[in-house]
Amino acid sequence: MPHILAPSLLSADFTDLRSAVGLVDDSPAQWLHLDVMDGVFVPNISYGIPVIKAIRPLTRKVFDTHLMIVDPDRYVTAFKEAGADVLTVHLEACTHLHRTVQAIKAQGMKAGVSINPHTPVSALEAILPDLDLVLVMSVNPGFGGQRFIEGTYRKLEALRELRQRTGSGALIEVDGGVAADNHRKLIEHGADVLVAGNSVFGAPDPRAAITTLLS
C-alpha cells in the first residue's frame, strides 16, 4: 500500500490559511494534519475548533486531527461537528483511554492514540486492537521544526511487530522532523503515514516537496 502524506498546518502561514489549505487540496497529499495544542499538555497554544470549522469547506482532504490537550473527552463531539475525520488523543493525557477511543468511534471518526518519545510502545498493547491509527512522536510535542529523534526507527519496528502480534489493523503514523532525507527510511521501518510540516510549508517549492515526500 502506498504511504500517506499529511502536511501539517502548524507550519503554514497563519495569515493566509486559505492558500495553505488550497495548496494541499491541489496536491497529491492525501491528508491534512491539524495540531491542536492547549498550552497545558504541551508548552504552546496553536488553534482549535473554530479554525478547523472555518477551513473545513475549503477541502475534502482527510482532516487528521491531533489533540495535544488535557481532558480530550470533553471535546470529542465538538471536533466531529467541526469536521475532523481522524481524531488522535495522547495516551499520556487520558485517564480512561479505552473509554475515550470508544467515544471517538461512536461519533463516526477514526480513532488514533499518540505516544510521546519517552513512552514505550508496550504501553499500547492492550488498546492497539481497538485503534485505527497510532501516532509516534519523533520530537517532543509542542513546536514545529524540531530535530528528529533517531530512536524513532527502533520504536517503529517495535510497533510494527506489536501490530502483527495483536492482529491490529492500525496505521502507523510518525510526526516530527520528517524530511526528504529520512522519509524513505521511516517507511522501511514501518511508517504508513508521514506528517510533514516545515519540510512542506518551509520549502522553496512546497508542491515539489510533497511530490518528493510521496516518492
Language model regions located:
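Short acidic, Gly/Pro-enriched loop/turn segments at secondary-structure junctions
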Residues: 141-144, 188
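Short, acidic/turn-prone active-site loops that include or flank metal/cofactor-
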Residues: 92-94, 116-118, 139-142, 198-201
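Solvent-exposed beta-strand sheet faces enriched in polar/charged residues
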Residues: 66, 114, 173-175
